[in-house]
Amino acid sequence: YKSDNVPKNTVDLTDSQWAVIKQGMRQMVSDHTSPSALINQINVNVAGKTGTAEEDTTRPDHALFVSFAPYENPEVSVTCVIPHGYTSGNAEELAGMVYAYMYDPDKLDTLDITGNNQMSD
């Protein structure tokens, strides 16, 4: 596959600036996601950023999660977007399943899929 798309512009960041961004993404997963969450139970360190996007006040927010792994030497990026997915935790949970499939498939055997249908703020 060859794409003819060309970036419109780029952002020049120093290596230390990139390191801070990547460290923040790792800390978001390791420090701000439950230790019992699948994404923190698999045999790979994931770095990521959650987010939501509001379409209007009468429908649930869209759930977003962008990520990469392994944190120490990235091989893959997983991005999950769930239209009207309520909260970014749902997109993060889905990404955790993808990483488990890739790096620790035995974790999927006992997975309890419940979802989190809480409304975002």
Regions found by a protein language model. Give the residues of each.
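Active-site beta-strand/loop architecture of penicillin-binding DD-peptidases
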Residues: 1-16, 22-109
